[in-house]
Amino acid sequence: VSARYLAAAEKAGVKPLTTHRLSALRALMSTGSPLSEEGFDYVWRDIKPGIHLQSMSGGTDIISCFVLGNPWQPVNRGEIQGAGLGMDVAVYNEAGQPVVGEKGELVCRQSFPSMPVGFWNDTEDQQKYRAAYFEGFDNVWTHGDYAEQTANGGWIIYGRSDTVLNPGGVRIGTAEIYRQVEQVDEVLECVAVGQEWDGDIRIVLFVRLRDEATLDEALQARIRQIIRHGASPRHVPALMEQVLDIPRTLNGK
């Protein structure tokens, strides 16, 4: 199931643990977007305590996952368990060095079994293909995910690199903001963008609310407080706007 579906189910008060017999359910897989720590809590509290919860990250283009679940390893709250078989995965900083415990670019350092070999109707020297995956670091597949490898071997995805915000020169993954805003009952969904403003970048947050809710000053203050407390003052949006809907890609992201 998608991480967004789990978040929506939690907000709707859905508790399969109390309405269904789930003794045969052994594992639950989450994909589509990063599963928040609160999403892990919801599954273990209201769906099935102790179930093997597998978040994952990959892509249609590779027909696979770079990082995913492993039935033989423990599951840590908010983390993906490990790298896929045949995937030489790492997180690179801006200098192209592998780092642990720091945020950076998710990369694969060697070819892998399901790696596409090119694009249809590309140039002879594969300009589009190389621009899509190999411009970031020389001969290293850069997948476009803003990620972190934890000290215990787990992985955290903070969102797509092309959606990373940079207010005051500090890189912020949009998922870091969404994880906090999802806690607000009045908010159905949201999207954060960076806007050039007075020589810097400011964060603008668009929110879709429940029908009876209004983005008044009190609700804005509560959202800002939750973001400030759960993330940092840097994550707090400079501007919030209420919208009727949020644009999506063809596959619902």
Task: Give residue ranges: language-model regions.
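AMP-binding/adenylate-forming catalytic domain of the ANL superfamily
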Residues: 229-253
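General small-molecule cofactor/ligand-binding pocket signal
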Residues: 54, 90, 240-243
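Glycine-centered tight turns that cap/initiate beta-strands
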Residues: 24, 186-189, 245
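Hydrophobic beta-strand positions
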Residues: 90-91, 148, 247
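Short coil-to-beta-strand transition motifs
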Residues: 80-86, 141
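AMP-binding/adenylate-forming catalytic core of the ANL superfamily
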Residues: 112, 139, 144-235
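Conserved ATP/PPi-binding loop(s) of AMP-dependent carboxylate-activating enzymes
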Residues: 83-84, 97-134, 172
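Gly/Ser/Thr-rich phosphate-binding loop
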Residues: 8-75, 88, 95-96, 120-124
